Amino acid sequence: MIDFKKEVIDRSFEMPIVVDFWAPWCGPCRILGPVIEQIATEQEGQWALVKLNTEEQEEISYQYGIRSIPNVKMFYRGEVIDEFTGALPRQMILEWLKKGLPKPGLIALDQLLAEHANPEATAVESLLERYPDSPEIRIVLSQLILWDQPAKVIEILEPVKMGTPYYDKASHLREIASFLCMSVDDAEIMEIQDLIKGGHLHEVLPKIITTLGKNPKVADGQLAKAAIGIFQTLGTQHELTKAYRKQLDMVLWA
């Protein structure tokens, strides 16, 4: 028997874990087993294989809804992120792994964030140099340097194109950065820019709402886009979103 929490759940925070749910009496399991074991050996270091005998660990099998075997589930950061049932041929398993495995850049980023909840921007920049194709790293780095280096944020996020999973997040960050990069001679807008750059969101959000209440299209509409971007970036559960988002919607859409 395996220690499921230790060997699967806990370890999945370090790397993806693929669990093969099988039983000795299962013919298709005997077909799948050697194939997936060989692939695990070939791809050692990218993910780890754990074999779970459903006859020995019925409670775990029930917990994960195993009704037909062989069943293969991919765990990452404690959650099932993909699965298949049946004795798939080698090529289909390889395609499943290619599609479902978290990219190396995301794994490296998750490891960094697990060690440092608030990492230095330089550490994330180093990751981006190693994994330039990782949109997740681009998003996190942009969030870290947004107030100080908005022009660089626009550059960093340029490769995140429409139709990709992180496009919406990138767009909101770009809207904020674009507003901060604007050259204006309006003292009120300049003050708002300075407050945002200083990270004084508690102070600036009421000012933004007041300014937009007078003219929703001020600063060529960029202030409104930046305000929406700030709330989207903070998330719906953030205290500032709860306090001010409805007020923003009222001045923009009333």
Question: Where is each model-derived feature located?
Answer:
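A short beta-strand-turn-helix
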Residues: 1-17
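Short pre-active-site segment immediately N-terminal to redox-active cysteine/selenocysteine motifs
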Residues: 15, 22-25, 68
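Hydrophobic beta-strand anchors of alpha/beta hydrolase catalytic cores
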Residues: 18-19, 49, 72
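The canonical Cys-X-X-Cys-His
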Residues: 26-29, 72
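Typically the conserved alpha-helix immediately C-terminal to a functionally engaged Cys/Sec
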Residues: 28-44, 52
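Structural microenvironment flanking redox-active thiols in thiol-disulfide oxidoreductases
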Residues: 54-60
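Non-catalytic, surface beta->alpha helical segment in thiol-disulfide oxidoreductase systems
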Residues: 67-108
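Non-globular targeting/processing and membrane-anchoring segments
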Residues: 86, 98-254
